[in-house]
Amino acid sequence: DGTMEIRMWEYDAQIALMNKEYRDGVLYVKFPDSAVIYLRSNSNTPDELKICVCIGQKELFYEIPILKVKNYTLEEIFEKELWMLIPFYIFRYEKEFRIINGDEERLRSLRMEYENVAARLDQECQSGRMKPITGGALCELANNVVEKLASKYGNVEKEVTEVMGGKVLNY
C-alpha cells in the first residue's frame, strides 16, 4: 500500500536535511544508505522498495534495499557482525513449528543450532568483538521472540529458551 515507502522517504529526508550542506550557494542533501529488514518474506517479497521522485520532466528513482532475515545464514550473521538479526533468526522456522514440535530429531537439531548461537555469542564476548551486555541482551531478546512466536509449540519454545534463556555472559 506504499506505507513503508512513505515512512522510509520521510525518515531519510529528515536525516538528509539534518546533514545538509551549503556549497557555493547550493543546498546539498545526501540521503542515507538505508535498508528495510523484513522478518518474514516469501517469493513475492521484492528485493527493494522503489520510489519515483518527479521534478518537472525529470524522474529520479530512489531504491531502498530489503534485507530478508531468512536469507542470512548464522555464518553470515556472525561474519558480518549482523548480530541484531540473531533474535529474529527463529523466524526462518516459523512455518515448520508444527512439524518440528512433534519430531524429536528436528527438535534436537534446532536445539543444537541454538547451542551453536550461544557458543558463538560467548566467543564474540571473550574475543572482545562484542560487549557482554550486548551478548546478554541478544540472548534475552532471542528468548522473548521465541516465547511469543512459538507460544503454541511448547517443545520448540522449551528447547530454544533452555539454551538462550539462561545465558549470562560475564567477562
Where are these regions (language model features)?
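Conserved single-residue anchors adjacent to enzymatic active/cofactor-binding motifs
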Residues: 1-168
